[in-house]
């Protein structure tokens, strides 16, 4: 039976064969997926997803409109559409 803190689903099991020939289970924290744009689904640049508690608020995402949700290209198109539509 594993230790209680390894029974969580936030750890993934890795079956490892040791040099002695025995096989054991090693536990490793799961890694988060990359952050993607809400419109075009491309990976976002400058957005951290793992171990967020180590970073300050400004390091976790860009400080601009829709930072961390929409990529710069989609934001550029969105701004153009709103400006052209309002005139």
Curated annotation (Swiss-Prot):
InterPro entries: Ribosomal_eL34, Ribosomal_eL34_C_sf, Ribosomal_eL34_CS, Ribosomal_L34e_arc-type
Keywords: Ribonucleoprotein, Ribosomal protein
GO molecular function: structural constituent of ribosome
Biological-process GO terms, alphabetical: translation
Gene3D superfamilies: 6.20.340.10
GO cellular component: ribonucleoprotein complex; ribosome
Protein family: Belongs to the eukaryotic ribosomal protein eL34 family.
Protein name (record): Large ribosomal subunit protein eL34
């Amino acid at each position: 039976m594993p230790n209680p803190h390894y029974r969580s689903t936030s750890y993934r099991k890795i079956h490892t064969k040791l040099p002695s020939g025995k096989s054991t289970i090693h536990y490793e924290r799961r890694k988060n997926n990359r952050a993607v744009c809400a419109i075009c689904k491309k990976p976002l640049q400058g957005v951290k997803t793992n171990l967020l508690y180590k970073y300050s608020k400004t390091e976790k995402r860009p400080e601009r409109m829709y930072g961390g949700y929409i990529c710069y290209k989609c934001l550029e198109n969105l701004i153009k559409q709103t400006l052209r539509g309002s005139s």
